[in-house]
Amino acid sequence: MQIKDEILSLLKRGKNLLAFSYGSDSSVLFYLLMQEKIDFDLVMINYKTRKNSDLEELKAKELALKFHKKIFIKHAPKFQSNFEKKARDFRYDFFEKICLEQGYDHLILAHHLNDQFEWFLMQLSRGAGLAEILGMQECEKRSNYTLLRPLLFISKDEISSFLKEKDIFYFHDESNENEKYFRNYIRKNFSNAFVSEFHQGLKRSFSYLDEDRKKLYDFENIKEIQGLLICPKNESLIARAVKMKGLLLSTAQRKELLKGDCVLGGKIALAYKNEQAIVFEYETCQKLPKNFKEECRIAKIPRLLRAYLYNHKIDISSLSF
């Protein structure tokens, strides 16, 4: 089992942060990165939902100390409902915070082929477009850092065999057996058996589908200007830009995209000008100066965008939309 050369090339050129849980997948990734002599640090969320949660945290700290790595840990609150989504949002918000504050270029995730197929089936069951169904890529650019998934075309069976072959220590996550979580239900009843039997064909299919996705949705059309993501008024491109800002849209949110300016998830704003969509972090300002408001009016700057421009001291005349 090896990390692809193109991903290794990126890892060798940047500052890297591994999302670590001490589960099987991130433990394999830790081993592979060490084997390739890649420099990286660790970030971990303790949800305190398992009997071994605190022991896993302790052992992760010991591992970081042993190999002279920084480790960033955050304890999650108790989520009363919709655990999967809230836990995911909490996790990625913290990962992004650390990447931005500490200057990491790459966030390394241990998603593998089974995860990719589970996601595919979950989105298919909910009603989703191509951009959402193929929501995982090996290299995924965010606004200020890049997500890397070196194991995305490696199956869970291959990971399990590698763990046994190399005698790699890891913690078993018993919560993965609980079918009250939709992902686990999909995994146990549909995806795992399929991947085990058809993993080679599945790898080829996802590779072909990703190439088709790139041709259908030219993501090079998403431009970044001073923290603003700008793209044509296209639902899939807008959804992609919003995702680059760290928000994964629900089906209901996607339906609202083309209706007009709006705030998504309370943190990402979307505004339109001249058939261009502008995606940015939602900000407010107590009071805009009268001369700035007039400048915005003349330039026909969307109201939702004005506070962001003012707060970041962006020259309106420098904008090309």
From Swiss-Prot:
CDD domains the UniProt entry points to: TilS_N (cd01992)
GO MF term set: ATP binding; tRNA(Ile)-lysidine synthase activity
Catalytic activity: cytidine(34) in tRNA(Ile2) + L-lysine + ATP = lysidine(34) in tRNA(Ile2) + AMP + diphosphate + H(+)
GO biological process: tRNA modification
EC number: 6.3.4.19
InterPro entries in alphabetical order: Rossmann-like_a/b/a_fold, TilS/TtcA_N, tRNA_Ile_lys_synt, tRNA_Ile_lys_synt_N
Function: Ligates lysine onto the cytidine present at position 34 of the AUA codon-specific tRNA(Ile) that contains the anticodon CAU, in an ATP-dependent manner. Cytidine is converted to lysidine, thus changing the amino acid specificity of the tRNA from methionine to isoleucine.
Description of its domains: The N-terminal region contains the highly conserved SGGXDS motif, predicted to be a P-loop motif involved in ATP binding.
Protein name: tRNA(Ile)-lysidine synthase
Gene label: tilS
